[in-house]
């Protein structure tokens, strides 16, 4: 399971420094690729394996302030599709989880501010934030026999946020 994310910049795509853009891509994309590429040879040898990348709903939504982060998370979704096609014949499955706002250290600034939290919860049909166990449960399913015919997919777990108009 790959779960890498940094976002040192909030603002317009016109203003992001190259160093911030590079850091986002290095951590959020390249590190996932490296980890998968280290694991895949052993999976090929045993003709079995599961790759899971934790992405974000940012990868399927546009953003005025999180553009580079969103680009990196969309890339995660494409990585699993490519790995699924390339390594599926070796019985290696690759899938992605795209969480909405989950109560984690990474999202602390979004949920500790009462106004921001209220805004996010009111924009979510379930009217709450997600719990890390809800993401972990999806990863367990993907890695278990219950997920044995699932590959190349992105599972959105966001309390319904992305279905809102």
Q: What residues fall within each predicted segment?
A:
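Short C-terminal tail/terminal secondary-structure segment
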Residues: 10, 61, 140, 151-165
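Substrate-binding pocket helix/loop in short-chain dehydrogenase/reductase
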Residues: 11-13, 17-22, 120
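Active-site loop immediately N-terminal to the catalytic Tyr-X3-Lys motif
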Residues: 14, 61-67, 89-90, 127, ...
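C-terminal helical subdomain
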Residues: 33, 96-99, 118-146, 150, ...
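Active-site helix of classical SDR
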Residues: 36, 72, 80
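Alpha-helical segment proximal to the catalytic Tyr-Lys
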Residues: 41, 85-89, 148
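Residue(s) in the substrate-gating loop at a strand-loop-helix junction
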Residues: 56
């Amino acid at each position: 399971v790959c779960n890498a994310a940094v976002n040192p910049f909030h603002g317009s795509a016109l203003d992001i420094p190259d160093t911030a853009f590079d850091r986002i891509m290095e951590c959020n994309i390249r590190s996932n690729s490296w980890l998968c590429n280290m694991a895949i040879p052993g999976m090929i040898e045993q003709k079995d394996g599961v790759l899971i990348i934790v992405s974000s709903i940012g990868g399927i939504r546009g953003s005025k302030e999180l553009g580079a982060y969103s680009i990196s998370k969309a890339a995660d979704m494409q990585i699993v599709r490519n790995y699924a096609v390339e390594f599926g014949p070796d019985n290696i499955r690759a899938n992605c989880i795209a969480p909405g706002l989950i109560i984690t250290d990474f999202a602390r600034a979004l949920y500790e501010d009462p106004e921001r939290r209220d805004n996010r919860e009111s924009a979510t049909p379930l009217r709450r934030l997600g719990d890390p166990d809800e993401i972990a449960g999806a990863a367990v399913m993907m890695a278990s026999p219950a997920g044995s015919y699932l590959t190349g997919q992105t599972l959105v777990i966001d309390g319904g946020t992305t279905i809102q108009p």
